[in-house]
Structure formats: structure tokens, C-alpha cells
Amino acid sequence: MAASSASTSAIQQRVWQGRIPLQIVLSPSECRIYDQSDPYIISIPRLSYLPFILPRLFSFFSSSLIDPDVQAHDGWFSFEGVPLKWHYPVGLLYDLYAGAEPITSKSLSSPGSEREHYVRGGTRENISESGAEGEKDDNHGHDHEFKRDALPWRLMVHFHDWPEQDLIRLDPEGKILHDAFINSVKEADCLRNGTAKRIMALSKEDSSGLWKSVEEHNLPAYHRIHNTLLLPTPPTPFRNIPIRIFLPAPPDSPSPSLKVIQSPIPPLIQPTASPSSSISSASRQMQPQVQTIGTALNSLLPSLFPSKRTPMLAKPVLHGAVVPMSAPVEEVVKCAGYADGWLGVVVSMVG
């Protein structure tokens, strides 16, 4: 059963309220007093991007920098020695690298859990609200204690030694970051509608307004442009779901690289009648089935998700929360997609 418009808007608002506290230090090799400079503390929206705070960081650390000629756009971030891709939202980077245990509906029901959830960087709303009515998930058997030392997320900022093999350089005007975002929006639009005509038809004012709404973290302005002008007009369904599955490298991996799975996923699973089926059985099978998180993951990663209903070996994590396997993918992307229109699901191993 599709989530109501009010429910979708409420969950989207909760997702936009999600924030992550950061503690950022200057690279000791670039600091006049080595590792003795004060850290920069900030709470940043999960849907935001790290380069947005580079001007503030540059101003804060400028008196400690050895090289007076570096500029704000020379900055890049690392976590435990791994360069962080600046075109990924902060929340996605945190889910990928910080290693905190994701929230489940069971942990949210425990005393004090809502505050714990907000403090450790998740969204207040349980994404299961977008799940199909009448279905039940077994997401509760793999809960763990919170990793309380995961926040604030401790990052390092550098203004020298740009990792050319890992990151594309930024520019003073922010055009490269803007173009990367718009290109991602175009790709998502093409998957949703079968064409990128909607975003290509946006006026210059609306195109600039979409980017500005992300920079300023302005949900009403974003909602007016993205949800009104780019999403298919109801009741027209999505052609495909813009979804990326992120597989972090295993602990014993020689490199910190991650694998990204991306494939067209339709919102409905078309029926396939078996030759041996009875007429009544075949009639039931001829009805399209709603594509859920579980069916999508089973299709893309059957070895990690052998069951379409139960997270036996791995869990799908979105915005710091475990997504119910029965949640319809189209409803999830409408209410919990990132600002570029994509679902960024992180695979977290069970146990």
C-alpha cells in the first residue's frame, strides 16, 4: 500500500533534520604547532556536503597553517587516512566509514533510544513507516549495542598533498561541486522518467534554486523544485528507481576502496507464469508485485541477501537506520532519497 502524501512529507522532513556532529582537526604536517591546534566542532546536516564548510575551516585554521598561500578550495578531508569523496553526502560517508551500529525499530522502542538515535547521527523517524501494510520483517534479531564513541565523527582536513588518484580537484567558485551534483540529479531523473527532459527543461532560476536549496539546507525550496518539477506526476509510476548499493571493503582488504552496485530497478516486478501452473494460480501470478528493498537486494546481491524478507547475512542501512526489507523501493526513494534523488543504501554485515 502506497504511503500517503502527508506521511511521505513527514518522513522526508525527518530525514532532512538528521545531523552529524563533526570534530575536525588540521593535518599535523601542515600545522605550525603540529597537533596542538584546537579542533573545529560543527553539527552538519546528513544531506549536506563537506566542501560547503571549507571556507569556515580555512578561516578557523588560517593562523595555524604553515603555508600562507593555500586557499579554501585546496581543502580535502580524510578519515583514518582514507580520503573522503567530496561528491558523496556527509551522511552516506558516515554510514560507510564510521562503523557505528545502525538503528533498528527495536532499538528505537527502548527507553531513551530516540535521543540516542538523534545524538549519534541518525534520523528521528523510523523508515519502516514507508513499509507495505500488512507485511512483517525480521529486522529485530540482529540488534547490537550502540558504539557510543562513534560521535562526534573525527575527521582531518588537509590543504596540501591533494590525493589525485582518489579525488578530483575543486575550484574557487564551487563550479565543480555544483556540476557533479547536477549531473547526479540528471542521471537520477533519467532513471525515474526514462529521459532527462524534466531537468533539462528547468529554467535557469529553478536549476540555480535547486542547488541553492541544498547549499542552504532549505527543504521547502527544495521540495518546490525537486518534488514538484522533477518527480513523475501521480499516478504515473517511476520508470526505474535511482538506487546505489555501497559495499564497504572487508576489514582485511589491502585497500580502503568500496564497491558500488548500480542497476536499473523497476518499481514493479512483472509476473512470469510457470508452464505447470494451474489457471487460478497463473492468474494470481500475472499480477505485478511491488518491488521492495528485499526483492531489489535479492536481485542485485543474492549471495548477501538470499532471503527477500529477512536480513540473514547483511542489513540495508539508509540514513543511519536499518531499512525494513518489505519497504516498497519507490516509496522509500520518495521520502528518504538523498538531495540528488538517489537512494544510497549501505550494506552492513550482520554479527
Curated annotation (Swiss-Prot):
Gene Ontology biological process terms, A to Z: autophagy of mitochondrion; cellular response to nitrogen starvation; piecemeal microautophagy of the nucleus; protein transport
Membrane topology summary: Peripheral membrane protein
Modification(s) after translation: Conjugated to ATG12; which is essential for autophagy.
Coiled coil start-end: none
Biased composition (Basic and acidic residues): 113-143
Region (Disordered) residue spans: 106-143
Transport listed as a keyword: yes
Domain of life: Eukaryota
Localisation: Preautophagosomal structure membrane
Covalent link location (Glycyl lysine isopeptide (Lys-Gly) (interchain with G-Cter in ATG12)): K186
Subunit (UniProt): Conjugated with ATG12.
UniProt record similarity statement: Belongs to the ATG5 family.
Xref: PANTHER family: AUTOPHAGY PROTEIN 5
Protein name: Autophagy protein 5
Gene name for this UniProt entry: ATG5
